[in-house]
Amino acid sequence: MTNNHPATLTEKLIVALDVPNALDGLKLAETLGDAVSFYKIGLGMLTGGGLALAAELKDEHGKKIFLDMKLFDIGATVEAAVRGLTQFDIDFLTVHGDPHVVNAAKQGAAGSNTKILGVTILTSLDRQDLDKCLIKDGDIQDLVLERAGLAFEAGADGVIASPQEAPMIRALPQAKDRLIVTPGVRPAGAALGDQKRVATPAQAVANGVDHIVVGRPVWQAADPRAAAMAILDEMA
């Protein structure tokens, strides 16, 4: 099955390599072939050779890499960590969207091609979850919008948010030329898993999202390549 979709569409799909180790991740990437050009490596994979996998996918296979670390620490530590990670030529890197964290990350990424994405509120959380964590009262969409605005003002190249909040974020003046990247995307009919604020690939694109992140619906599929191609078809 040949991928006849344009590269501009293929790059909108980021597949999360949430598999046990780098070898499994590489095998999956080889199975997906030209159907996927962008991969997310999260904290779980980092302990299983994730940075080595990132380097191999970049250098040997020409793929783009989204390193999902959600860094959160004092400014000096974040800046140093980001500066060290830029040696891997990462395309996207996540930090928590707090202004001091974003600002430090941007300083650490200076002179590199790494784009810093600020996390607003995890797509696996709803208002009840926020209440348990003693997060301030208010509609969750309003909180996401507030955090997105603060992240943009601190210099973030983009934000992580659910596709449900994407239209409001896109309408922010600060969002001009910034990226909106959304987990919480599930193909029509797919199980939600641990996601709560979700949309289909087609809905996400219609809502102004730049990139969608999909994991289990691809790598748990009997035919991962066909699953990825079906998602691209939904997005087209």
What is each stretch, according to the model?
Residues 15, 39, 70, 93, ...:
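Conserved, mostly hydrophobic/aromatic
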Residues 34, 60, 88, 154, ...:
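Structural motif
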Residues 28, 76-85, 169, 190-210, ...:
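Catalytic cores of alpha/beta
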Residues 38-92, 99:
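Metabolite-binding pocket within alpha/beta catalytic cores that recognizes anionic/polar moieties
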